[in-house]
Amino acid sequence: MAEPAILGGPKAMPDGMIKAWPPIYDLDRQYVLASLESDSHAFGPNCAKLEEEFAAWNGNKFAITTNSGTAALHMAVAACGVGAGDHVLVTAYSWSSSATCIIHHNALPVFVDIDFNTINIDPDKIEAAITPRTKAIIVVHLHGLAVDMDKVMAIARKHNLKVIEDACQAHGALFHGKRVGAMGDCAAFSFNQNKCLCSGEGGMFVTDNEEIANAARQIWSFGETRTPLEKRDYHAYALGWMYRKNGLTPTFGRGQLTRMDEYLARSRENTAVLLKSLAGVKGLIVPTQPEGFLHNWYNFTSRIDMEALGWTGEPAVMRDAIMQGIQAEGVPVGIWQSYILPAMTVFQAKNAYGFGCPWSCQHGSDIPEYDPAQFPKAQRHCDTHFGMTSPLRAPHGADVAEAVGEAFRKVFENAEKLPGLPDRERPARA
């Protein structure tokens, strides 16, 4: 095998081989142009059509378009009756919105460590984290792999807790044949640039519970009870926000939704090619898909086995050297999150709104502690991971997946020679 590109060898991935995501087709253009020629560009019929079509595709009774997945998460927390001082359990490793949505409604996040193999919340650690103030559990189907929902739902029903699915990355992922977003009490999806369903920006709130749907709709539009498509009385019946989606971007999302199943199939085909190519690579921990789960492969996230490489220094130093080596091969890998959630300043400072609120709220009790050392598996993952999104998606085929595999192999097989490693800690060649 040739030398890594970072050491002077040829690139595994030729320039121009990786295309932009998402692919744009004539139907997308037709929908968008038709919207531009309409009389309204705010929330309107295009949003309602996307709601109907997405609900049918995902198997939900109710769907509400939002301007982001973050907005949909806040709506979920509020609609589930979470209030001041309540506790909501959430994974210690995710995007910040998975936990800050709890603070948005004056409640307190309680973090739970991950299962290192799945990178998702460890269901076996959930029950120990429940307190008398716990009101809900947010499960994040991270990088497109579902959480073990049988275990989560059993715990939730035992303790009378609501379950919110953060499915922002998991469109089309399955758990024992059931789609994510259709197993808990409600769920949030994101449609931003990188997601498997892209409308530029935006999101979707979904539920099968009419009471929860009505509560979410109030939060969504100024505390009102009627949508902009109905005769509004412009009366705020509750505290509300403005989380509505505009009328243009849903048209793009509708066009993309017609190809979602095709996109997912392509990602799964390409990932199978890549996993076969990476079998037996020393020091590489590839992502898992347990029996009964169907991944959507939103983010192909790998970890590095430092012990297997003989590396005794800081894990992030070796991770960064390997990542830079793969980038030099033309493969756009990167770090997804540099900090676990409990280590982020907003939680360490416990001062979201000033004066220590909401942690200092008079309605709060059993104030959680956010010591990062309590979440060793999340920290280990954070320090050793790198991932990628677009190379395994449409319009790419097996040739791109094979080039990615070659890039990984070249770099891992020459890990001891990579630049950026201190000589005194550089692993010996096996």
Locations of regions flagged by a protein language model:
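Conserved PLP-binding active-site segment in aminotransferase class I/II-type PLP enzymes
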Residues: 1-75, 79, 83, 157, ...
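Conserved PLP-binding active-site segment of the aspartate aminotransferase-like
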Residues: 287-291, 297-312, 332-354, 383-399
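Conserved PLP cofactor-binding pocket of PLP-dependent enzymes
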Residues: 223-232, 278, 319-387, 416-429
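PLP-dependent aminotransferase-like
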Residues: 78-167, 174
